Amino acid sequence: MSVLFTILLMAVIGGFIGAMTNYIAIRMLFRPYKALYLFNKRVPFTPGLIPKRRDELAEHIGKVVVSHLLTEDAIRARLLEENLQKEITETVAKMFHEKMQLETTPNELLHQLGYENAEGRSISWLETVLEKEINHFLTIKKTSQMNELIPVMLEKELETKLPHVTERITSKLTLFIASEEGKLQIKMMLQKFFEEHGKMGSMARMFINVESFSEKIQQEGAKLINQEDTKNLINQLLTTEWKNFEAKELQELIPTEKQAHLAEQLTSEIIQAFPHDKIFNQPVQVILRDYEVMIKSKIIPFAVERMLDFVATHSADIVERMDLAKLVETQIATFSLQEIEKLVVEISGRELKMITYLGGILGGFIGVIQGILAIWI
């Protein structure tokens, strides 16, 4: 009986020592958090292994993460996965659909982004820029001829329109002369002519019936205007005037002292014509409503695909600039030792307990052997 008791006692003692040894060894990975001193000498094994090597551990984990986990190839492969593209597209489309149910004006949107009085500031900025650019244009182009400033396409278009202008002029003149107003105007001109020529005019008036003579002039005037020679003459005059206009320098038409006033006036006209109230106070959703289906089905998938492709193509530069190793190291360094211990225990708690139990089993086995050896030796 004493033999069995001795063996069991040795097994219990060995198991207890083995379990406690492993338990203490595990605890010494984290504890104590700080170095302990006795008689101004640091106590051995303090602080614990992880607190002592914390900085090195953080640095090596960062390097391992970048070298073996978040590699450029791994990131690129993940970004180019169809499932990821599909998930992001669905998420963006869902967010867009939710926003389309609201009514948000550009003014409100810019206000949310911290841009106060967006409409007023934008109009003020546009006004300043326009006036500055117009003044600049008038200054640097003042010695340029008009044919240099007018676009070639517009110049050709205007030249082709000159015959039409001639036709319109002759048509309007014919209608005017044939009208009662035209007849009255001719009659008044004849009467004025006679009055201005004194006795000769009075004598001529005795032999000429102003009414019938006015009608005759009216008829002949209409015929004269519609003759090809007259039309050619008018067209030639218009062409000559147009060429003279093109040959003039800008400063001849707009003197330097009037440039500022003209720039201000043009700017004012442009600002008044600019539909800023509609642009800034109409809900964005109203503007996009007609394009909602196209945005969801085409623009969002295309934008997501291009974005992921761009990030994947430049993943090496992005990873390098982000310095992921340093980022991981910094994040680990911000963890308190208590948090690190808790994290490790939560992840490996069961395995750590098994190590403790294994120490107890091995210790018990060694105790049995020691008990047997103690009895027989």
UniProtKB/Swiss-Prot annotation:
<dbReference type="GO" id="GO:0005886">
    <property type="term" value="C:plasma membrane"/>
</dbReference>
<keyword id="KW-1003">Cell membrane</keyword>
<protein>
    <recommendedName>
        <fullName>UPF0754 membrane protein lwe2241</fullName>
    </recommendedName>
</protein>
<feature type="transmembrane region" description="Helical">
    <location>
        <begin position="1"/>
        <end position="21"/>
    </location>
</feature>
<comment type="similarity">
    <text>Belongs to the UPF0754 family.</text>
</comment>
<feature type="transmembrane region" description="Helical">
    <location>
        <begin position="357"/>
        <end position="377"/>
    </location>
</feature>
<dbReference type="InterPro" id="IPR007383">
    <property type="entry name" value="DUF445"/>
</dbReference>
<keyword id="KW-0472">Membrane</keyword>
<dbReference type="InterPro" id="IPR016991">
    <property type="entry name" value="UCP032178"/>
</dbReference>
<keyword id="KW-0812">Transmembrane</keyword>
<keyword id="KW-1133">Transmembrane helix</keyword>
<dbReference type="Pfam" id="PF04286">
    <property type="entry name" value="DUF445"/>
</dbReference>
